[in-house]
Amino acid sequence: MRPAELPPPDPDALVTSRRLLERIGAELAASGNWISFARYMELVLHEPGLGYYAAGSRKLGSSGDFVTAPELSPLFARTLARQVKEILEPGEAVLEFGAGSGALADVFLQEISVPYFVLETSPELKQRQEQRLGARVRWLDRLPQKFRGVMIANEALDAMPVHAVAWTCAGIVERGVCVDENQLAWSDRGAAGDVLLNAQKIPVEVPPSGRYESELALLARLWMRSLARILERGALLVVDYGFPEREYFHAQRSMGTLACHYRHHVHADPFYLPGLQDVTAHVDFSALARAAAEGGLDLLGYATQAQFLVNCGITEVLGKENPGDPARYLPAAAAAQKLLSPAEMGELFKVLAVGRGVTTSLCGFSNGDRRSAL
């Protein structure tokens, strides 16, 4: 879909977007009219009071821009809780990154009585979580120094800033952002530093067009290493859309994975209404697994969301709904279809588990474990 075909913003939202544009323009003016796309993504998503996750617009649900698995139905949280129960030892806790509306924690805590922590960067979402969850949850401003238990990152990594890179016949360039004719635009520079070093390690074949574009999630790798430092015992479960490296940098994916979400429409222009749309990139699960290994964590499993949920017993969870109550059963069955269908979330979404000191095999990966693909 082209931006011209998208629904118009309301006047107040447009004012916020224009203020953010001024903020971006000021940074560009102070930086020689070029910033990395990772920095641009940080600004449009997280700039205090103005960024997508830092301002007050509604993100989730029918009136927002996208719907996550916990929003669809309690099925996801109830099924995930089965895996978490298997990992947890007495006295341990759960830590969720980016808890959205609080739907996952709400249902999860009906299944398991456990200390539950949330690390949330969005003030608006934190307020919604507080209203929904109350005293059942504790909110953190930063990572704890040590942690024992299970950490959950459900659709948290896709919104972490990424560096945009292009492999060309002339070499590797970093795609940044500039102002051109009073409009935000892409601008190439020769890649350098960590961006160049990491891009050189990827066996990209430059197509006949002479250009292959993609993303490097360097921040996600740092995030993984930081979790490895604090995890004394337990596991991290990452649920997100993405691919192993071989598929991520496939020859047919020469335009990368960047996508923008605005009022349930997906398009490809990251410069449209800055601050009013979500800007995302798919997760490179191979890079994430390597970062975990570098931090001393064990790779516990990797599977499609559909396989993981089936292994954890989603059909049994659905079976607890009464088919004689269509008002409850039919929405639950429809949600299960969306969570499991290869045409919906079942195949594109993956589950990665890494950890330390977990000696039991995890039920979520008992069949269809794709660790060898990483």
Regions found by a protein language model. Give the residues of each.
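A residue-level signal for conserved active-site and pocket-lining positions in enzyme catalytic cores
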Residues: 44, 151, 288
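Conserved RecA-like P-loop NTPase ATPase core
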Residues: 76, 151, 240
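Acidic active-site catalytic centers that drive phospho-/nucleotidyl reactions
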Residues: 96, 120, 155-158, 240
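A short SAM/SAH-binding and catalytic strip from SAM-dependent methyltransferases
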Residues: 145-169, 214-218, 222, 230-237
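A mobile, often basic/glycine-rich helix-loop segment
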Residues: 152-201, 251-261
